[in-house]
Amino acid sequence: MRTLILLTTLLLLALHTQAESPQGSTKEAPDEEQDISVFFGGDKGTALQDAAVKAGVTCSCRTSSCRFGERLSGACRLNGRIYRLCC
């Protein structure tokens, strides 16, 4: 359990650092939503993914903060950049 909390904290810290770093010009609008594939690794990841599908959870990869009713669920990588995974 402690390991999971530590890994989650490190992931969020890396995501926060990535969000604050100066970004070069992008070809996409900052608030544009992208269709992505989200993969969870390992046996527990499969259980998490199955639970999300059963619950009807919709996740989006966002450049800015999560919208009302969404919460930060992790990070996603798109075209080599890391974004917020909001569900």
Curated annotation (Swiss-Prot):
> Which terms are listed as keywords in the entry?
Antibiotic, Antimicrobial, Defensin, Disulfide bond, Fungicide, Secreted, Signal
Stored SUPFAM superfamilies: Defensin-like (SSF57392)
Q: Where in the cell is it found?
A: Secreted
Secreted keyword on record: yes
Tell me, what is an example of a GO biological process annotation in this record? antimicrobial humoral immune response mediated by antimicrobial peptide
- Provide the disulphide bond pattern: 59-87, 61-76, 66-86
Family of the protein in this entry: Belongs to the alpha-defensin family.
Q: What is this protein called?
A: Neutrophil antibiotic peptide NP-3B
* Source species of the chain: Rattus norvegicus
